Amino acid sequence: RNMSGLYFLNVGKTGSGKEHANTVIEDCLEAADAMHLRGPSGYTSSSAVLSALQEKPSHIAVIDEFGSMLASASAKGNQNKKDALTMLMEAWGRQTKTLRNVGYSMVQMTEAQKKSMQIEIKSPSLSIMGMTTPETFYEAVGAKDVASGFLNRILIVESKRPRELSRNPDQIDVPKIVTDWIRQVSTTQGEGASMISDQGNDFPPVPQVIPFSEQARTLLRDYEITITDRQNTSSPMIADMMNRSREVAMRLSLIVAVSLGDREISSVSAQWAIDYVDFYLRQTLEIMDVRISEGDTDGLRKAVAESIKESGSIGVKMNELIKAVPRLGNLKKHERDGLLAMVVEDFPVERLV
C-alpha cells in the first residue's frame, strides 16, 4: 500500500520567508480545530519519536533549523540525535506496518515495567516540514547521510529567488472551504469504521483506498525506468539519492488526488507529482554534486572549484579566493598549494602564477 506521509524540506536564505509554511500549517489546523494533528518541533532521541507517535499516531512535525539538527546528530558523542534520525527513517517506511522500539535490558524489571518499555505504534503516519538555510544544511550533510537512506526520503525544495522587499498583505481568515476539507480528510476512513479521534496507537483507522488508474501506473513505471537509467550512469552518491524518488512521487500523487476530491489517482495527478518531484530532485542532485563531499578535504576542494567557476573567464586572485572560501586561509602554504593542484587536476581550471 502507498500511504501519504512525506518529509519536506524548505531550503532558503535567511529572511526569504521559508518559515511561512509553518504559519500556514498552524493557522489552518487551528481554524479547523485540528491542532491535535500538530506534533513537536523536533525529536531528541528515538524514544522521543516513539513517544510522540504513541500520543499522536498521526501528526505533522514542523522543524525549524533542520540543518542544525542534522549537524547536531553528526557530532561525536550525540548518539541520541543519531538514533532519532534512524527512527525517523524507519517511521517513513512503516506506515502500513508496526513501528517498535529497540530492545533494552529488562533484567530485574517488574512485569509492569517490562510492559511499559515495549512500545508499538501500528500504521504510524508521520509528516515532517523542515526549514533550513543552504549554508547550514549543506555543511551539515555528507555522503554518509545519503548512503544511510535518510536524505533520499526527503523532498528537498530550495528557493533560488533573490532577497526581496517585505510585503504587507491583508490579514484574512482561513477560508471555510479549507477548514471543511481538513475536517473531512482528517476523519475519513473506510466504510464501517469509527472516527479517527476514537483510535489509539494500537488501533489504526481503516484507510480509505484510492487506487491508481492504469494510466497513472504506466506513468510511474516509465518514471522508474528513467530513474534507473540515470542511476546507472551516475556516481554512487547521486544514484543513492534517487532510490526513493518514485515512491515519493506515488505518495505525492495520492495527496494531489485527495486534494482534488478524486476517487482514483488519475494520470493528471500522477504526472503533476512526477514533474514536481523530478524538478526538485534534479535541482538537488546538481547542488549536491558540488556541495556534498566525502570529507573535509573533498568539501574544501569542491568549494574552491565552485568559487573559481563562479568568477567566470576573468578568474579570481588568491586573496579573493580566500575571502570567498575562508577555510582556505586556514591552510598552510604547502597544504593550500596541494589543494589547488587537486582542483586544477580534477576540474576544468587553470592556475596562472
Where are the predicted features?
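Phosphate-handling catalytic cores of nucleic-acid transaction enzymes
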Residues: 1-353
